[in-house]
């Protein structure tokens, strides 16, 4: 899906599912059986490519009008824009001489220079593991709308102000209702209103503490977005979607733009490369585990857990507006660690695969249903514990309010 040089990293636009032909043949020797005229035209270019940095699935497809190689998943997206991209199977279809020569003359660098010359630093570049919506809109923005070759088409997410209606899940009744949202960089806030003519917002979400991540499976809609912000130092979840995929991705990138401009002011010496990873974040791990209370004599209860950076939150339901409790997980140097299993004295019936989180204040006993889930959670916890804490994270730790 990505269109980048084979040797570049993701932040520089590395390819997730789109490849230069020389790298394809070098990285996947199984394709060497293809007709000589299709693989020989770029043999002289292979030495300059580093296929070891490639990511994503085998590129068995190609857009012969754009000159890029793509995986099966992205080939379906390209087929939906036939006026721009025409797709063939690398293995199964017949290639004409002119098509082969065009593929040889293109490649990632040429395509990037044409279609990605003006990608804003805040614009989210999806990877092969991102949801269908992000990958589709990235492809359409590049090739169909040509937003990154014509900056005037970036206004929907670059203007610093955005207003519109989104379907929002009710905090208490769980129903999705149309609500007016206003994003204003000048005020540093995202606001929503219960009525279109309301003068006062129902909620004000400060850009400083706001995050957005697509959660289509959890929300039950392919365009579902989870927005979180801090309210009284506790995390508040807002679940929204729009029927138009472009609208939803424009909202997402507008939020990232607002975060980017806020951080530029807050950290004037930081480079774009330093700021971009802080614009939005996906959760390190999510899923059901069982937990017991602070006395560790209470029965284990099934809860939905979310690991958001250093915040471990648990909910009765995945779509709850507020967490039942939050735990700050610091670094090993600050007295935090994670242990495989539960203490021998643990009481009550629980799932068989235990995890013990040790903090300076107490131990948290958790249990997973399967060994693979336990391994995934242990890996997520250890990544956080092994990472040194930043100065601002000590401040968060000091003011953290834990709800047992």
What are these regions (language model features)?
Residues 159-161, 260-322, 328-329, 333-352, ...:
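Disordered regulatory linkers adjacent to lipid/PI-binding modules
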Residues 34, 38-47, 72-155:
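Cys/His-rich, Zn2+-coordinating zinc-finger modules
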Residues 77-78, 83, 181-216, 235, ...:
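Structured beta-rich ligand-binding regulatory domains in large eukaryotic signaling proteins
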Residues 56-66:
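Canonical RING-type zinc finger of E3 ubiquitin-protein ligases
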Residues 51-54, 71:
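Short cysteine-rich clusters marking metal-coordination/redox-active sites
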Residues 127-159, 217, 239-276:
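Eukaryotic cytoplasmic intrinsically disordered
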Residues 173-179, 212-262, 296-302, 338-398, ...:
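Canonical pleckstrin homology
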Residues 2, 19-21, 28:
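Tryptophan (W) side chains
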């Amino acid at each position: 899906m990505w269109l980048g040089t084979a040797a570049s990293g993701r932040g520089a636009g590395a390819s997730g599912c789109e490849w230069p032909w020389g790298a394809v043949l070098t990285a996947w020797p199984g394709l060497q059986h293809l007709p000589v005229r299709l693989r020989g035209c770029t043999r002289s270019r292979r030495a300059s490519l580093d296929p070891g940095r490639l990511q994503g699935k085998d590129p068995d497809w190609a857009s012969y009008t754009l000159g890029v190689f793509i995986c099966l998943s992205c080939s379906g997206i390209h087929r939906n824009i036939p006026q721009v991209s025409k797709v063939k199977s690398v293995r199964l279809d017949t290639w004409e001489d002119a098509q082969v020569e065009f593929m040889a003359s293109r490649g990632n660098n040429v395509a990037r220079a044409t279609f990605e010359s003006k990608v804003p630093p805040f614009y989210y570049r999806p990877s092969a593991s991102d949801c269908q919506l992000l990958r589709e809109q990235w492809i359409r923005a590049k090739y169909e709308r040509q937003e990154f070759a014509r900056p005037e088409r970036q206004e929907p997410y670059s203007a610093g102000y955005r207003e519109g209606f989104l379907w929002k899940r009710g905090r208490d009744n769980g129903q999705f209702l149309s609500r007016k949202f206003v994003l204003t960089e000048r005020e540093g806030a995202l606001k929503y209103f219960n009525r279109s003519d309301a003068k006062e917002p129902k909620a004000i979400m400060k850009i400083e503490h706001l995050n957005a991540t697509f959660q289509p499976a959890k929300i039950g809609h392919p365009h579902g977005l989870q927005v979180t912000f801090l309210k009284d130092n506790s995390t508040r979840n807002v679940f929204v979607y729009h029927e138009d995929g472009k609208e939803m991705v424009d909202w997402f990138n507008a939020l990232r733009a607002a975060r980017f401009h806020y951080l530029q002011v807050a950290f004037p010496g930081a480079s774009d490369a330093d700021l971009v990873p802080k614009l939005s974040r996906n959760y390190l791990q999510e899923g059901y585990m069982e937990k017991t209370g602070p006395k560790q004599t209470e029965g284990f209860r099934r809860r939905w857990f979310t690991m958001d950076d250093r915040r471990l939150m648990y909910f009765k339901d995945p779509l709850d507006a507020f967490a039942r409790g939050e735990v700050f997980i610091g670094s090993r140097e600050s007295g935090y660690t994670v242990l495989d299993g539960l203490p021998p004295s643990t009481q009550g019936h629980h799932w068989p695969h235990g995890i013990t989180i040790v903090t300076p204040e107490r131990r948290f006993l958790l249990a997973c249903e399967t060994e693979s889930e336990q391994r995934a959670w242990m890996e997520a916890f250890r990544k956080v514990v092994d990472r040194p804490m930043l100065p601002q994270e000590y401040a968060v730790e000091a003011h953290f309010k834990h709800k047992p």
